[in-house]
Amino acid sequence: MSKKIKVGIVGATGYTGVELLRLLAAHPDVEVAAVTSRSEAGTAVADYFPSLRGVYGLAFQTPDEAGLEQCDIVFFATPNGIAMKDAPRLIEQGVRVIDLSADFRIRDIPTWEHWYGMTHAAPDLVSQAVYGLSELNREAVAQARLVANPGCYPTCVSLPLVPLLRQCRLKPGMPLIADCKSGVSGAGRKGNVGSLLCEVGDNFKAYGIAGHRHLPEIRQTIAGLQDGIAEGFVFTPHLAPMIRGMHATVYLHLSDGICPETILRDYYRDSLFVDILPAGSTPETRSVRGANLCRISIQQAAQSDVWVVLSVIDNLVKGAAGQAVQNMNIMFGLKETHGLGAIPLLP
């Protein structure tokens, strides 16, 4: 590509923001032209993130000063409630937008307002947003002006289910249970007692049992693919004593006489970022650390009609910034692997 794509990042001081900067630094077709932060305006990116010394010469600017309207695409790596106020103006000016927050993920406005506790500022734009689960909506993402990047739990849970749901292979009326674990970085970079080392180290706990914001997002995907399944979906997230990584164990009931591994392999045969492991394998979170990968295995529980799906991602990469870059590549007709060739870190 002769002319590089001009990229802006709004809210670049959080974990997803620095992941975007890390990934885009290795992208051959983009130029990061603007990075914003109200609290760190004037601070050099390399001073704020020592890992980026010698990589970026930019300084953070306020959104009003950054010239975002001159970018080809803008990523919003902001808390919920920001993109829905600021993205409409950019879209009107011809800028394409990928929102990493939850502002445009839920199509039913009352449902979104219930779970996120605020009035939606751009309800008319929600119907125009494409849900950016890349392997499900690739064609729609390619044409999108606004992509709602999925949440980390929804990505980890949905990717192994999509091929089975598309063929209506789950048994209606039976429970579908997702037991998930996340690294602490999923809580973001803000100060929080629950994220302190003394709280999470040598500890393991469930949270959000009465209702997690990602529940309606996952149910929306399920309901859009197969009837009679979403109502029986149960989701329990856990906080694991690790920095990054996500593991989902999904228990499901399938139609008789099928080979689910074959269905998964056939669906993801040409997908570069989904790895279907051999039967009996148990994917590990460290096998995807730092990479835009989802590794999946499926096997039947012993002496049971229950199937067990295991799925792992890096919550900051395939669960956030990596999938956002993948969606950008699709939107601009680039190779999906550009900027996403990192091999997982081990140990």
Curated annotation (Swiss-Prot):
Which residues are annotated as active site? C152
Q: Which reaction does it catalyse?
A: N-acetyl-L-glutamate 5-semialdehyde + phosphate + NADP(+) = N-acetyl-L-glutamyl 5-phosphate + NADPH + H(+)
Q: Which PROSITE patterns match?
A: ARGC
Q: Name one GO molecular function term.
A: NADP+ binding
UniProt GO BP? L-arginine biosynthetic process
User: Which pathway does the protein contribute to?
Assistant: Amino-acid biosynthesis; L-arginine biosynthesis; N(2)-acetyl-L-ornithine from L-glutamate: step 3/4
Question: Per its UniProt entry, which superkingdom is the organism in?
Answer: Bacteria
Cytoplasm among the record's keywords?
Answer: yes
Q: Which UniProt keywords apply?
A: Amino-acid biosynthesis, Arginine biosynthesis, Cytoplasm, NADP, Oxidoreductase
* Entry EC number(s): 1.2.1.38
Localization per Swiss-Prot or TrEMBL: Cytoplasm
Assigned GO CC terms? cytoplasm
UniProt cross-references to SUPFAM superfamilies, sorted A to Z:
Glyceraldehyde-3-phosphate dehydrogenase-like, C-terminal domain (SSF55347), NAD(P)-binding Rossmann-fold domains (SSF51735)
A Pfam family matched by this chain, by name? Answer: Semialdhyde_dh
Tell me the protein family, please: Belongs to the NAGSA dehydrogenase family. Type 1 subfamily.
Job description of the protein: Catalyzes the NADPH-dependent reduction of N-acetyl-5-glutamyl phosphate to yield N-acetyl-L-glutamate 5-semialdehyde.
Q: What is this protein called?
A: N-acetyl-gamma-glutamyl-phosphate reductase
Q: Which organism is it from?
A: Neisseria meningitidis serogroup A / serotype 4A (strain DSM 15465 / Z2491)
